[in-house]
């Protein structure tokens, strides 16, 4: 579980463990009180390991799901502001997510993000062995990180051992997710080199930082969901990748932020301006808050579209070969429709 990166970490983890075991995993992000039991019921005697994702958006949801899962190991990716509308504070989110750590017994392993400030408190709540993994801290770390549109390469550090690894997606936050998966693999006896093979071959759930090229224009499709933390991470990835042309961000609304909604959207716009995005298009009323904040922070080319179709029309007019365009928003914002409309307009190209 975690505020961000649950599904990608699950995919990496299943692939890493699949180097040694017959693995079943949650399909997509079917991770709630209906999805988790259904996934478990679909497990057969052929499977040796299950990798199950647990989600929540209200208090009291993780503990009963953790009891159903009865995990031998647990991963908590991070604590952010996703679902803060229903939880109130990050501290409340940490308390809720930490229920998964409490469900692991003394023979098990709890894997935490060494770079997340809430991990120290969560670690105190479990009887299990705690393993910390992070880009900058922990017993598993990453160094010599290189990124391109086709993915990331980095060196895994574990004590005195080093191993080069590759991911099919870019983004430092994806490297972090991968390290958590490697920690799970090591906890189950998978060799470090085999963990790296698992990362390189992991089939990832769609719309998570996928590169799609349409007539020379590259789209960074991260449209599945969004919150302020994941938006900022995606914007950083956009700016870290090489592009022959401009870097453009097309951003939709972020749901379930409650009282933090206005400020959360403003922070994303301010981050886009600070990073030096060439152009930003915000979609809808809340997307307009993003673009307005970006313009106020100094990003001159910051526009608002009333709908995904209007955003697509703007891109059709301005996009040129070599441009790299980030597409991101909450699930209900359907920002992926921008890519489909752009593809249809550009000579019926297929995505």
Where are these regions (language model features)?
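Phosphate-binding loop of NTP-binding sites
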Residues: 1-109, 114, 118-126, 317, ...
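Acidic, Mg2+-coordinating active-site environments of NTP-dependent enzymes
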Residues: 73-219, 244-245, 270-273, 277-279, ...
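Glycine-rich phosphate-binding loops of nucleotide-dependent enzymes
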Residues: 66, 73-74, 202, 308, ...
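Short SAM/SAH-binding signature in class I
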Residues: 49, 73, 180, 320-328
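Conserved RecA-like helicase motor-core motifs
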Residues: 21-28, 133-134, 300-303
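ATP-dependent carboxylate/acyl-activation modules
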Residues: 206-208, 335-340, 349-351
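Peripheral docking tails and interdomain loops at the edges
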Residues: 304-306, 320-343
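Active-site beta-alpha connecting loops in nucleotide-dependent enzymes
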Residues: 204-205, 223-299, 304, 348-351
């Amino acid at each position: 579980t975690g505020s961000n990166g649950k599904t990608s970490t699950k995919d990496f983890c299943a692939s890493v463990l699949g180097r040694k075991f017959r693995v079943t995993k949650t399909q997509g992000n079917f991770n709630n009180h209906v999805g988790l039991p259904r996934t478990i019921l679909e497990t057969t005697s052929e499977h040796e390991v299950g990798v199950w994702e647990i989600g929540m958006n209200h208090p009291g949801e993780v503990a009963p799901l953790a009891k159903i899962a009865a995990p031998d190991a647990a991963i908590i990716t991070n604590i952010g502001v996703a679902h803060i509308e229903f939880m109130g504070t990050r501290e409340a989110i940490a308390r809720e997510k930490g229920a998964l750590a409490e469900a692991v017994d003394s023979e098990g392993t709890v894997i935490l993000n060494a770079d997340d400030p809430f991990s120290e408190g969560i670690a105190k709540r479990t009887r299990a062995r705690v393993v910390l993994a992070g880009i900058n801290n922990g017993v598993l770390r990453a160094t010599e990180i290189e990124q391109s549109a086709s993915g990331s390469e980095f060196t895994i550090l574990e004590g005195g051992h080093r191993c080069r690894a590759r991911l099919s997606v870019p983004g430092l936050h994806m490297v972090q997710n991968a390290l958590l998966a490697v920690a799970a693999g090591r906890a189950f006896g998978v060799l470090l080199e085999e963990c790296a093979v698992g990362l390189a071959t992991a089939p990832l759930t769609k719309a998570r930082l996928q590169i799609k090229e349409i007539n020379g224009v590259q789209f960074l499709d991260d449209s599945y969901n969004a919150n302020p933390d994941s938006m900022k991470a995606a914007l950083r990835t956009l700016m870290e990748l090489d592009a022959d042309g401009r870097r453009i961000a097309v951003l939709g609304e972020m749901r379930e932020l409650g009282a933090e909604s206005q400020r959360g959207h403003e922070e994303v716009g301010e981050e886009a301006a600070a990073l030096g995005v060439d152009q930003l298009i915000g979609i809808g009323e809340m997307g307009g808050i993003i673009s307005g904040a970006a313009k106020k922070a100094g990003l001159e080319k910051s526009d608002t579209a009333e709908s995904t179709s209007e955003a697509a029309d703007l891109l059709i007019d301005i996009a040129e070969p070599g441009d790299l365009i980030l597409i991101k928003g909450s699930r209900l914002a359907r920002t992926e429709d921008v890519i489909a409309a752009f593809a249809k307009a550009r000579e019926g190209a297929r995505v």
